[in-house]
Amino acid sequence: MPTCQCEVCTSKDPHDNRLRCSALIRTDDDKDILVDCGPDFRLQALRADIKKLDALLLTHNHFDHCYGLDDLRPWAYWTPLPTYADKGMSQSLLTRWDYIFVHQYPGVPKLVLHTVHPSQGDVFKIGETEVTPIRCYHGELPILGFRIGALGYITDCTKIHERDLPKLKGIDTLIIDALRWTEHPTHYSVAQAMVIVEYLKPRQSFFTHMSHDMGLHVDFERRLSQELSKLFPQTLLDTVHLAYDQQEIIVNC
């Protein structure tokens, strides 16, 4: 965090130096799916050497998750990029980025908007991979999570709709919001995220969207065992890790 002098913000460990939350998912049939496109996307794309994109999934309309859309031009200039969002996010796109979606300005990225409806059981495919939108709540704001094949991706969340939570059963890997150790009005705490991990029991889970209040990356797993061993079995705690920038994760399908 700018101006902060805490041990995390001044850490030299690259695991503690995080840009805004996003993910690039490569499927077995070589489709590259981007989840969210925040204002750090250009730098993230250069670091990761992203050559192509086949689809964009958007969780919600907050600045840190979508204000990099204009930087998609190199990946969506010649070939339109399918873009998936819920009704609320779609309305924001048509209003805030009307020069992309309504009155196309010359040279803008060609984003083809598809509005999905979790309440109607919408499921769609990107290549051979099935994607299921999951209704979540960021405080009071309805947002989307996604099941992408055997991967669950849930960010900025305080609740997963009871109708949709079972749709995540059977996943191999879970990436889930866990802002800090103490509770927050619009994000899961570590203990709250662990409740979801315990319900789903994936092979591996990664906490994302952490603030500097989470503490040093190197201390996380020890602290997790110390603070939550009376609430959750150690075998479950051992499957949980902090995500970090440029991390590559193998998902077993």
Feature map (PLM): residue ranges:
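Binuclear metal-ion centers of metallo-dependent hydrolases, dominated by the metallo-beta-lactamase
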Residues: H161-C253
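Binuclear metal-dependent hydrolase catalytic cores
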Residues: M1-I154, T158, D219-C253
